[in-house]
Regions:
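Bacterial N-terminal signal peptides
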Residues: 8-16
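Short helix-onset patch at the extreme N-terminus, typifying the N->h transition
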Residues: 6-9, 69
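C-terminal motif of bacterial Sec signal peptides marking the signal peptidase cleavage site
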Residues: 18-20
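N-terminal catalytic scaffold of extracellular/periplasmic and nuclease hydrolases
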Residues: 23-168
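Positively charged n-region of N-terminal signal peptides that target proteins for export
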Residues: 1-4
């Protein structure tokens, strides 16, 4: 993955920040938290899709994807700790844990120390954790939320960490 498009992450954080500063009359715990990752998706993918939708509707521009209409919208590109171009393992780790790592490392830092993803403290707070993916759950991006290994290619080792996560 050359670029990470973390639109929904930014939107979720923005909405959380916005809702926390407005109307503090009644605070309640979020019932659901969703994180959507367009793995490998960039701004050009969105622009082409919106252009296609406009052409399909017989318009010159104007059609927007729902995600580009959110009140808070953000994008980012990333690089890993040791390369300009990142991979799904390193970028997934950065998204999941907030820490950059080396290329091909999954859920561990540059010194091979395990990094815990944001999903673990949420699980401890009582949230149910589900990881859904259009690729096998042992692939780097979804695995970054439950596994730790210096080699993203260690599918068996990654798979063996699923039960230990305690996720639902």
């Amino acid at each position: 993955m050359k670029k990470i498009f973390t639109l929904i992450t930014a939107v979720a954080m923005g909405v959380a920040a916005l809702s926390s500063c407005c109307n503090k009359q009644e605070e309640s715990k979020a019932k659901y938290i969703f994180l959507f990752i367009g793995d490998g998706m960039g701004a050009s993918h969105i622009a082409v899709t919106e252009s296609y939708l406009s052409a399909k509707a017989g318009k010159i521009g104007g059609e927007q994807l729902t995600m580009t209409q959110f009140p808070i919208y953000g994008t980012s590109t990333t690089h890993c700790e040791n390369k300009t171009i990142t991979c799904s393992a390193a970028s997934g780790t950065a998204i999941a844990s907030g820490h950059k790592t080396y290329y091909s490392r999954l859920g561990c830092d540059k010194d091979f120390n395990p990094l815990k993803s944001m999903a673990f403290p949420l699980k401890e707070e009582g949230y149910k954790i589900g990881i859904m993916s259009s690729v096998p759950i042992t692939h780097a991006t979804p695995a970054a939320f439950y596994a730790s290994t210096p080699d993203r290619g260690d599918g068996y080792g990654i798979m063996m960490q699923i039960p230990d996560s305690g996720f639902d």
